[in-house]
Every structure is written in structure tokens, then in C-alpha cells.
């Protein structure tokens, strides 16, 4: 209907990524982004599960079959998306030691400093690993990491966005120094400003454009590579690929 533009950053998992469109029973359109690899799909399904017990069951079954160290280790592979996915699952479903998983977050954020999610995980590791006497320094470093994540832009995974909000709330209410609480409140203001427009596409994060011509359902071909057009009615989803002439 040309009513909105919804955007998502697609994680390019090793082995491939699928982007699926489906009809919502209410007549809208659902978007799901997931890895092609079946084991990685398990991680994605666990993380995107709306029911915590269901996700916990998927994660527990996964960790019985597959050593988590195969995905989270000091030798960060050229697939940061799966590393992030596994770390996020370890945070949400702590059937393994969360600290064990997050010990590699500094290396992840160093190698892939352009991925906002890596800085969110770094902040999480700093906060849960701090000794009582190190709380002030840990809070300052965590705030720096969360500010970096926010300035880099939208995260790739919806749960990263949830964690960012949770940590800012905790720091706003309980950081050891007043200046840190003030900084967390300021960051919280930036984050919550766009809260009504935030969505999820499977385990991936998506958001609805909320201002200007970009919010009216059309993509400007000067700034977008349009691969396909589609339409939805009560029972059918039609996708038509764009065929561009070869020069």
C-alpha cells in the first residue's frame, strides 16, 4: 500500500542467509532473516523465540549436540554473525557460563569494530565480570561501548537492541557514580526516542522509517539497489524480480 519503509541489516552468515516474506493473518507482511545452515538456524530460532521456555529448550538441545566453543573461541572466524548469535544465546539462556562465552567479546569488538552488536556484547562482559572494587571503571567502559554501539547505528540482532536498553536502564538506575547515571540517562534518551519504530525480523533487528519521504513506502533508486517488487492481497504474496539490462 506504500505506507511505510521497513529496513533491516542482513547478517551474511557463512553458508548463506535466507530472507523470507510471509503473510500475516492480520493482512500485513512478515519478514524473517535466518541462516541457511541448520545448526545455525537452531541458534536463530532459540534467540527469536517469544516464549523463553521454548528458546531455552532449543538452546539446551543445541548445546548437548554441539560444543559452543566451536562457534565462540579466541580464533574468531570470518563469520562474526554466528559468533554474535551464539554469544547472545549464551546471555539469554545461561545453561553455560555466560562469562565463558563473553570472554571473547573484546577480541570480537576489536576485529569487527564496525558491528554495533560487538560493542553491546563487550559492555555486557564488562558489567558481569567486574569485581566490586572495579565497578566504577567497568561502568565507565561499558557506557563507552554502549555509546559506540548507538553511534554506529542499528544493530543486526533484535536481542542486541534489547540488551542495550536493559544495560542502559541498569546503569541509569544503579551506576556507582552520579556522572555515570547522568550519562546513562542521556544515552537512554537517544535509544528510547526510536523505540516505537523498532521491530524484529526473526532474530534480526528491523525498524520502520519514521520521517520524510522515505517513510511513505517508496525507495529512492538513487540510494537503493532495488532487487524486486512485490504485492500482497488477502491470500497471495507476489514477488517480481527486477531485470536490469546488461550494458
Give short role names for the model-derived ranges.
Residues 4-50:
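Extracellular beta-sheet/turn segments enriched in Thr/Pro/Gly and aliphatic residues
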Residues 30-60, 64-67, 73-93, 113-128, ...:
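Amphipathic alpha-helical repeat scaffolds of TPR domains
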Residues 57-71, 97-109, 133-153, 175-198, ...:
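Alpha-helical repeat scaffolds
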Residues 82, 199-218:
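Extended, charge-rich alpha-helical scaffold/interaction domains
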Residues 128-130, 209:
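Short alpha-helical linear motifs
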Residues 143-151, 155, 162, 169-173, ...:
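Long, compositionally biased low-complexity segments enriched in polar/charged residues
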Residues 236-246:
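Short, low-complexity, Pro/Ser/Thr/Gly-rich segments in the mature regions of secreted, periplasmic
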Amino acid at each position: 500500500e506504500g505506507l511505510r519503509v521497513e529496513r533491516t541489516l542482513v547478517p551474511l552468515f557463512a553458508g548463506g542467509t535466507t530472507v523470507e516474506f510471509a503473510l500475516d493473518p492480520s493482512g500485513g507482511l512478515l519478514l524473517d532473516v535466518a541462516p541457511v545452515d541448520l545448526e545455525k538456524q537452531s541458534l536463530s530460532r532459540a534467540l527469536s523465540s517469544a516464549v523463553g521456555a521454548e528458546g531455552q529448550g532449543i538452546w539446551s538441545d543445541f548445546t548437548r549436540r554441539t560444543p559452543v566453543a566451536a562457534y565462540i573461541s579466541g580464533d574468531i572466524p570470518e563469520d562474526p554473525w554466528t559468533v554474535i548469535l551464539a554469544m547472545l544465546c549464551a546471555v539469554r539462556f545461561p545453561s553455560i557460563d555466560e562469562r565463558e562465552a563473553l570472554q571473547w567479546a573484546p577480541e570480537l569488538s576489536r576485529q569487527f569494530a564496525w558491528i554495533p552488536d560487538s560493542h553491546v556484547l563487550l559492555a555486557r562482559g564488562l558489567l558481569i565480570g567486574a569485581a566490586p572494587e572495579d565497578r566504577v571503571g567497568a561502568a565507565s567502559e561499558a557506557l563507552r561501548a554502549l555509546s559506540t554501539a548507538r553511534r554506529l547505528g542499528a544493530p543486526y540482532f533484535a536481542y542486541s537492541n534489547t540488551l542495550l536498553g536493559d544495560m542502559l536502564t541498569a546503569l541509569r538506575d544503579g551506576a556507582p557514580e552520579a556522572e555515570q547515571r547522568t550519562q546513562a540517562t542521556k544515552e537512554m534518551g537517544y535509544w528510547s526516542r526510536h523505540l516505537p519504530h523498532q521491530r524484529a525480523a526473526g532474530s534480526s533487528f528491523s525498524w520502520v522509517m519514521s520521517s520524510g519521504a522515505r517513510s511513505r513506502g517508496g525507495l529512492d533508486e538513487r540510494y537503493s539497489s532495488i532487487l524486486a517488487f512485490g504485492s500482497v492481497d488477502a491470500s497471495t504474496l507476489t514477488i517480481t524480480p527486477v531485470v536490469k539490462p546488461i550494458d
